[in-house]
């Protein structure tokens, strides 16, 4: 053993062990590749990605930190998502949440044939200092 050397077990590393998983089919309907990072709120991913948004609310990809999933134009693949843990607050991304994760804020558009889920405008409140800024 060398000074500072770390010897680790030669076993499989399980990421997000104990988290409930959700599997979604995702299709890139756009004309450009799209990459989604490991901790990106999947609900707020690029609008060219077609998937069940309601099931993605409050969840991120079940992949190691720093990794990403790439969707080429026309690609359709299955992804596994896990819920955010900790305080369960999300800020940034597209600004759709900017606060606590609350599934009651998600609703289906009744007059839209694609049944895309969105967050009601009156529910887009922010707890941060930049509230109301671009």
Curated annotation (Swiss-Prot):
<dbReference type="InterPro" id="IPR036461">
    <property type="entry name" value="Urease_betasu_sf"/>
</dbReference>
<protein>
    <recommendedName>
        <fullName>Urease subunit beta</fullName>
        <ecNumber>3.5.1.5</ecNumber>
    </recommendedName>
</protein>
<dbReference type="Pfam" id="PF00699">
    <property type="entry name" value="Urease_beta"/>
</dbReference>
<keyword id="KW-0963">Cytoplasm</keyword>
<dbReference type="GO" id="GO:0035550">
    <property type="term" value="C:urease complex"/>
</dbReference>
<dbReference type="InterPro" id="IPR002019">
    <property type="entry name" value="Urease_beta-like"/>
</dbReference>
<comment type="subunit">
    <text>Heterotrimer of UreA (gamma), UreB (beta) and UreC (alpha) subunits. Three heterotrimers associate to form the active enzyme.</text>
</comment>
<dbReference type="InterPro" id="IPR050069">
    <property type="entry name" value="Urease_subunit"/>
</dbReference>
<dbReference type="GO" id="GO:0009039">
    <property type="term" value="F:urease activity"/>
</dbReference>
<comment type="similarity">
    <text>Belongs to the urease beta subunit family.</text>
</comment>
<dbReference type="GO" id="GO:0043419">
    <property type="term" value="P:urea catabolic process"/>
</dbReference>
<keyword id="KW-0378">Hydrolase</keyword>
<comment type="pathway">
    <text>Nitrogen metabolism; urea degradation; CO(2) and NH(3) from urea (urease route): step 1/1.</text>
</comment>
